[in-house]
């Protein structure tokens, strides 16, 4: 913990082709071991596949997919009198985006297609069509929050 106050948030730079910060965040989430150029190659490849299969602008499809994955509420564990309660809380806007990208990349990695670009493209297209594992994760998160609505008064 720094003593000089809060650490300022680092701003990500938009990528050169799509001029989008959210695309850069996708690349950064996909990156392993600092291999950013490889992650960019995979993302651009995935966007090319999305464009060829949907005949639409890939960034539009990606933003639609993000809208369908982004969670609004989640549950957080809260200990009250020796019992743990799952308390539903609203998700902050920056965390919403981060969670959506994390889920998208995570479930893309688990898919069965041959290359990572194909997996990512498949997950993006599925999410844009309200199907796929990432959308299911969002629905499950919302269901969990709905089921624990009774503990909402424990919010902090």
From Swiss-Prot:
Q: Does the keyword Acetylation apply?
A: no
Extract the coiled-coil ranges from the record: none
Q: Which GO terms describe its biological process?
A: translation
List the CDD domains. Answer: uS7_Bacteria
What keywords tag this UniProt record?
Ribonucleoprotein, Ribosomal protein, RNA-binding, rRNA-binding, tRNA-binding
What Pfam families does the database record attribute to this sequence? Ribosomal_S7
Under Gene Ontology molecular function, one entry of this record is: tRNA binding
Q: Does the keyword Mitochondrion apply?
A: no
Q: Kindly list the GO CC terms recorded for this protein.
A: small ribosomal subunit
Instruction: Note the InterPro entries from the entry.
Output: Ribosomal_uS7, Ribosomal_uS7_bac/org-type, Ribosomal_uS7_CS, Ribosomal_uS7_dom, Ribosomal_uS7_dom_sf
Out of the domains of life, which is the source? Bacteria
The protein's assembly and partners: Part of the 30S ribosomal subunit. Contacts proteins S9 and S11.
Annotated family: Belongs to the universal ribosomal protein uS7 family.
Q: What does this protein do?
A: One of the primary rRNA binding proteins, it binds directly to 16S rRNA where it nucleates assembly of the head domain of the 30S subunit. Is located at the subunit interface close to the decoding center, probably blocks exit of the E-site tRNA.
According to UniProt, the name of this protein is Small ribosomal subunit protein uS7
Q: Which gene encodes it?
A: rpsG
